[in-house]
Amino acid sequence: MSDKIIIYQVFTRLFGNDRTNCKHNGTKKENGCGHFSDFTLKALQEIKNLGSTHIWYTGVIEHATQTNYEEAGITPDHPAIVKGKAGSPYAIKDYYDIDPDLADKPKERMKEFENLVARTHKAGLKFIIDFVPNHVARQYKSDNKPLDVKDLGEDDNKHHAFNQQNNFYYIPDQLFYPNFDLKQDAPSPYYEMPARATGNDNFSSSPNRNDWYETIKLNYGVDYCGDRQCHFQPTPSTWLKMRDILLYWSSKGIDGFRCDMAEMVPVEFWGWVIPIVKEKYPDIIFIAEVYNPNEYRNYIYNGKFDYLYNKVGLYDTLRGVMCGYTSARQITACWQSVDDIKTHMLNFLENHDEQRIASDFFAKYPEKGKAGLIVSACMSTNPMMIYFGQELGERGMDEEGFSGLDGRTTIFDYWTVDTIRRWRNKGKFDNSLLTDKEKELKAYYSQLLNLCNKETAIKNGEFYDLMYVNESSEHFNADKNYVFIRKSGKELILVIANFEDKDRNIGITLPKHLFDFFEIKEQKQVCGTDLLTGKEEVVSFNSAQRLMTHIPANGGKLLKIEL
């Protein structure tokens, strides 16, 4: 049986930075930067010990930056079209190269990347990178592409707003002229003629600060300004070039792609390219960042994706429950809406786009994420993802530079992540610099995530929602408690999540249908073990009496019962 996938997302540039006093909007020289070499075998083993099966290294491919790497053979970027001193990892400048920030020796960056792949596999982890298919940096230029590869835009007819074989969309005869300064600290202003459409589908020559102005949209054969008509025959040039890029990285031994803004790229492309890649590399997984539930099945069945973000649905609902403005009852509707595709949904409570649980913009306290973690990680066999520092209660409340004080860890700036830096402790990972609360939270995450693969009932078992027979009463708060069963063979786990800020004695109704459904006998009493504490307790296990138990505040219980 395959493992339940547990992904540890890490923002590669920030993980190993040991600087303690970073300057607002500081340069790499001023603030420092983490490297591939910080992911030692010890570091990777520690990440694996958290329960991780995969690690998603975010920001690996070369992207636009304000740091000059001419000595490494890289053309500098104009600062006016780079977000932050370090730059966004989603403004790719060379699909065939590695971000030089991440290398000890920038000229040897590809070799250092290949060593990291080998090291990751040696630690028993699978290796995931980003694939950013919708847009590239405005000054995209591949210095490292194979000799027989033509660059994006190299053969474009720039007189056509849309041409099926163009790689970009043009605004003919118009200068790129956004409503902000195009010079900044450079000797001369950034110049682009004709202007090209931005990555967020702004087809004008004058995007604003809220647009993805640092990127240009890739053309997959959809004429957006011509009633969105599709022109997929003959095969568009962009399809062929992106296929080759996916095959290039697959040949490096990676195990998966997290595909940025996948639904902004036509599903027909995915349905064409993913089988091509899998024919040669059958074990590679494709994860889609998607936000439109109406398109989920389209991107699974026609687009051939393995997994989709479960953001609009479970994440949004759990966030509401954790913050107190959504009833826990709504969790049932979440799984029901994707029940037929549940194995394809990737659950998470944090990632680089979302605010930290412990931030002032979310729940303020990391403990409030415990109950949500129980639900997100344990209710199905589908994958679970956490974001580096989540397991330590990282607050994301720094005002780093381009990224303001927004409850997120910056993806644009050179910075340090306080909790991660102290956990690493210069590579010792001895927990000596962590607070008692951080140690407790880390242990909780590690225990729960490891249970996901240790316990067959969670890893591969069936699911039974108990909320339909547990309405609010003096024994149960259906707005703050969520209960379900996971079962495999003779092992049954009663999972209880408590989103309340106080401990609670609760009574859970077990319906007769539960026993019929699983073909198990009702018993007056059984002995159960809480997998989170190791404590045993005797409880009722029948449809005539409530199962009474005690649950901690902002937490829960996984009561394992041997049938």
Question: Where does each model-flagged region fall?
Answer:
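Extracytoplasmic/secreted proteins, especially bacterial periplasmic and envelope-associated proteins
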Residues: 38, 42, 112-115, 241-244, ...
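C-terminal beta-sandwich/jelly-roll accessory domains of carbohydrate-active enzymes
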Residues: 500-563
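Loop/helix patches that line or flank the sugar-binding groove of alpha-linked glycan CAZymes
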Residues: 2, 18, 27, 65, ...
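Short, flexible loop/turn elements at secondary-structure junctions
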Residues: 12-14, 61, 99-102, 133-135, ...
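Alpha-amylase-like alpha-glycosidases and glucanotransferases acting on alpha-linked glucans and related
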Residues: 2-3, 7, 11, 91-92, ...
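A short catalytic or substrate-binding loop motif that flags glycine-/basic-rich loops and adjacent residues
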Residues: 48, 340, 474-479, 487-489, ...
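Short, polar loop/linker segments at the starts of domains and inter-domain junctions
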Residues: 18-37, 361-365, 536-548
